[in-house]
Amino acid sequence: MSKLSAILRRALALAARVVLLAALGICGWAFSVAAQDAYPARPIRLIVPFPPGGPTDVMGRLICQGLSDQLGQQVYVDNRPGAGSTLAAKIAANAEPDGYTLLLGSAATLAIGPALYRDAEYDPKSFVPVAMVAEVPYVMVASPKAPISSFSELIAYAKAHPGKLNFGVPNGAPPHMLAAWFKSLTNIDVVLITYRGGANVLSDLLGGQIDLAVETSSILLPQLSDGKLRPLGTPSSKRLADLPDVPTMAELGVPNFIASSWTGIVAPAGTPKAIVDKVNRAVNAALALPATQAKLQPLEAQAMFGTPQDYADFLAGELPKWIAMAKLSGAAAD
């Protein structure tokens, strides 16, 4: 065999291997696309970091119902409360990135938890944003037994009597962060009293054992409607439809004090974009339904629409803010 023939044979063999590898690559890509087109082929779990019955759980179940209808496959809630919502996030972060495990995230889960819990073992980069869901406004309130009845009176009294007013907060939760942030922005001396849970804060607020609190409008509206609490202001970007006489913090002279209780769906990092996009479209479609809108109303929740990139941009602004609040608060994990 001539030297030229040997070289030609080796070249042909190499070319054959290249063609084979390319074909295998195309087949693998085609298989991946087909698998994503077939998604979902089995039930999907949505991990909710709070116990059954609470506002976040209700929100999760509402979304699961809408997603089940849109995707044609069961989507169910898996309640995993504990460790300041970091337990649920840790489970989700370590799940297979195949679209069959989703997490209903919030500021508490994605920002505050990793900032307060050293053993959280995850951070925001452990997830890929999928879809925004809804936001609920906060309201700052005073006990009827407190020596103030308006925001201006709060500021004046706190400056005239440093350390005499107190603020009840659920330890390590978003209202704790907001109270600490409010103190910093207004430069007033009020004492933060920590509680194990928001229900205990509300009980003592109604009983007059504490003076001030900040909570979501969904929790406070019944007491506000009955006149059992005094509304002082809302850190919302606009006045609330159900509380039109309550001014925003910007109107009251604290323009940077803007925050809401938001929720959104995230998936383990590495989840294929095609699956992320498919779930995103399903969430948006479910949120747009009149039946969903009607069920959001009693929760004081406003649907949030957008692409995965919109949610990523939203988180890029929100997460650093809440992480900074967590550090400012000096809160310690229970």
Model-derived regions, located:
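Hinge/capping helix and adjacent helix->loop/strand transition within the periplasmic-binding protein
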Residues: 94-100, 115-200, 249, 262-295
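Short secondary-structure boundary segments
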Residues: 106-107, 144, 217-218, 236-237, ...
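N-terminal secretory signal peptides that target proteins for export/translocation
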Residues: 1-13
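Short beta-strand->loop
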Residues: 123-132, 168, 189-193, 211-212, ...
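N-terminal (or domain-start) structured segment
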Residues: 35-126, 163-165, 171, 175, ...
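An extracytoplasmic/periplasmic, membrane-proximal ligand-sensing/linker region
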Residues: 38-43, 251, 273-334
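Bacterial N-terminal signal peptides
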Residues: 15-29
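Sec/Tat signal peptide C-region and signal peptidase I cleavage site
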Residues: 29-35
